[in-house]
């Protein structure tokens, strides 16, 4: 069974600093890196387009970690994010919350 977990659900970050949001996943056996797609989506209440600012640190994927780096966090980055990991035909997601201290 493919599952995604988050070691930390809430991140409280000073405005202007960097943050790395972490999602962990367990493939249950040998990992085929080519079959993994990881994404972080901001959950928006409105329909305005949101430019994704998070960068996936791919070197951690073989360790079962999807790390998403957001540089120089701004108030507009605050909110709920959905971390989605797709592995072949299986997928799972978890929610993370980012709060910004101005």
Regions found by a protein language model. Give the residues of each.
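N-terminal edge beta-strand
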Residues: 1-24, 28-29
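Flexible inter-domain hinge/linker segments at boundaries of tandem extracellular adhesion modules
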Residues: 1-5, 41-46, 90, 96-102
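Conserved strand-loop elements at the edges of beta-sheets that form or border functional pockets
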Residues: 12-15, 42, 72-75
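Ligand-binding face of N-terminal immunoglobulin V-set domains in extracellular IgSF glycoproteins
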Residues: 24, 51-99
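Residue-level marker for the onset of beta-strands and adjacent loop->beta junctions
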Residues: 7-9, 36, 94
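Residues at beta-strand starts and edge strands
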Residues: 17-19, 34, 64, 94
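N-terminal V-set
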Residues: 21, 26-53
